[in-house]
Amino acid sequence: MKVVRKSMSGGFFNRIGRKLFGRRDVLTSANMKSSYQKCYDSILIIHHRVMVSTGEERERGLEDSVLNSAAIQGFCDVLEYYPNSISKAALAIDYIANFHPFVEGNKRTAFEVAVALLRKGGLELNDDDETFNFIKDVAWGKYDREDIEVWLRCNTHLSNL
């Protein structure tokens, strides 16, 4: 990964920080924006596929189906800090099912994003019917992120692929 030095500039705190502590430099990843954009775009594509596959795609375009883009942005901002595919999938289920970034299809999109994250980590879910009921319960607020992670650990197995 290429690392570049970037001077922190702008903003009230940064001006105060420079006055008190001198010039401050921060190491940033050169490909950070592309990673974030890839996450955001992937979620939009998954959502679009979910809506098309269930016959619910309306005349709206891909961007028009987003109700709360800040929820997707928040998810993509914190995703990289989670250590493994199970905790990332738990975050996806909790975040997308509860923050409702889309007009329709939030639970289905949460499920598909979680499946994609698990597959990326070499894991598969055991039973889709049980998973569907679990996702509904999550959306009703019956489980928090830690409960979701425990459930995923008990209901996944190594992929044969």
Q: Where does each model-flagged region fall?
A:
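FIC/Doc superfamily catalytic core
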Residues: 1-161
